[in-house]
Regions:
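Inter-motif core of Ras-like GTPase G domains
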Residues: 285-309
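Switch I (G2) and immediately adjacent beta-strands of P-loop GTPase domains
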Residues: 52-63, 68-72, 252-280, 298
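A glycine-rich (often HGG/GG-containing) alpha/beta subdomain
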Residues: 1-145, 149, 153, 329
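Short, Asp-centered acidic motifs that coordinate Mg2+ and/or phosphate
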Residues: 269, 301, 329
């Protein structure tokens, strides 16, 4: 990391300001070549967390006015000397300022290189680095909160608690076994069980957070299904907030799957409005119906729509049967009309039932609550730490299984050496999660998803 790197850190386009970030041992030297403060004070002589207003000059020509923010190592984002130049937000001007910085001795930063340097310099662990990209890409309040809590150490604190407990246990076991001549107190089975049970509870809690975390981060693959003209497209439009699906009184209008992503309460739903489920001789419509039936078997949430003013038919009953195979909310639509539907039968077969008028919006709040309940939002507590990706989940799961192996070894009377092997495997998995012990390939894969300038 001998190079001093630079990149535009704000989004491309025209705006009030743009920020060019420079990081590395020579950050101050590079910037002093092109930044001339109005008080003639060099950035290299300024204290950290201070700012200076001045001119950007290249080849003796003034390019722009700018504010330079100075951060001294190690008290900066990257842990290195950092300068952030805030100039006017024009596309051409911003690129001109960056070119001047590069001409002064900096090199272009790679994607995610600033955050990668923060990781390599011990400012953040790998889970916190992954949280940075999650903050940037968050599509809902819950997703942003969850990512921010991870960035501030919610997952790391849990991992450190388990890691330190297991390290202490393994060290005590090894010392007692290797130095019998020393006056080292023997570890009791009760102490070992306590250590394992506490570790298992914490790791189990993190594993449980994963599904809710994915629901708020990636969204739930959700299918709207029902027979023709029950109001599926109207429901799709209600949730989308716009006329996304065609709404008519003609059965079979929706022949293919229409997709949209919406935020319902604090949950992201990846919605699919499917063809009406019915027996048909129309070849094109039949293809749509077959696709709908296939899709609803694979979804993470089924919104099964029924018509309040029509009696149940065989297609409705087939849908009710499918509802037992996936998480489901039964939506009794058109409640503004006269009742003909056997709602008691539906309530006896499907746990979550919501009464709604998709046309007027009455009942929408109840639908939002039902979606949040199915997504586990009642138990969703970002401050407790939320695993945000499969890499983290697998590392915690591996550690959990190793702790369970250690507990099982104790229960069947294996030696302390055998127990210690499982404990050490559990610790290794946790170190892989934090990045304290992991391959360069894994690290590179994490930062590959970042944008340039972050």
């Amino acid at each position: 990391m001998s190079d001093t790197i630079a990149a535009i850190s704000t989004a491309q386009g025209e705006g009030g300001i743009s920020v060019i970030r420079i990081s590395g041992d020579s950050a101050f030297t590079v910037c002093d070549k092109i930044f001339k403060g109005i008080n003639n004070k060099k950035l290299a002589d300024m204290k950290g967390y201070t700012a200076s207003f001045g001119k950007i000059v290249s080849d003796g020509e003034e390019i722009d006015e700018a504010v330079a923010l100075v951060f001294r190592e190690p008290l900066s984002y990257t842990g290195e000397n950092v300068v952030e130049l805030s100039c006017h937000g024009g596309i051409y001007i911003t690129k001109l300022v960056l070119r001047a910085v590069l001409d002064a001795g900096a090199v272009p930063a790679q994607a995610g290189e600033f955050t990668k340097r923060a990781f390599l310099n011990g400012k953040i662990d790998l889970s916190e680095a992954e949280a940075v990209i999650d903050i940037i890409s968050a599509k809902s309040r819950s997703a942003a909160r969850a990512a921010l809590c991870v960035k501030e150490g919610a997952v790391r604190n849990k991992i450190d608690e388990v890691k330190n407990l297991l390290l202490s246990t393994a060290a005590h076991l090894s010392a007692w076994a290797d130095y019998p001549e020393e006056d080292i107190a023997e570890v009791t089975d009760e102490q070992l069980y306590d250590s394992f049970d506490v570790s298992i509870a914490i790791l189990d809690g993190l594993i449980s957070s994963y599904d809710s975390g994915q629901a708020v981060k990636q969204g739930i693959d959700t299918v709207i299904a029902g027979r023709p003209n029950v109001g599926k497209s109207t429901l799709m439009n209600l949730l989308s907030g716009c006329e996304r699906s065609i709404v008519t009184d003609i059965p079979g209008t929706t022949r293919d799957i229409i997709e949209d992503t919406v935020i319902v309460g604090d949950v992201i739903l990846r919605l699919s409005d499917t063809a009406g489920l019915r027996t048909t001789d129309d070849k094109v419509e039949k293809i749509g119906v077959d696709r709908a039936k296939h899709r609803l078997k694979q979804c993470g949430l089924l919104l099964a729509v029924f018509d309040y003013d029509r009696s149940l038919d065989d297609d409705d009953k087939e849908l009710i049967q499918s509802a037992g195979e996936v998480p489901c909310i039964a939506i009794i639509n058109k409640t503004d009309l006269d009742k003909q539907l056997d709602t008691e039968y539906i309530e006896s077969k499907i746990k979550n039932v919501v009464y709604l008028s998709a046309k007027s919006g009455d009942g929408r709040a109840e639908l939002v609550k039902a979606v949040e309940d199915i997504a586990g939002m009642d138990n969703f507590n970002p401050s407790e730490g939320v695993l945000s990706n499969e890499r983290q989940r697998q590392a915690v799961l591996n550690s959990l299984n190793s702790v369970k192996d250690a507990k099982n070894a104790l229960e069947i009377g294996l030696t302390y050496d055998a127990i210690t092997v499982s404990i050490e495997e559990a610790i290794t998995s946790l170190l892989e999660l934090t990045g304290e012990r992991t391959s360069d390939e894994v690290v590179d894969r994490v930062f590959h998803n970042f944008c340039v300038g972050k």
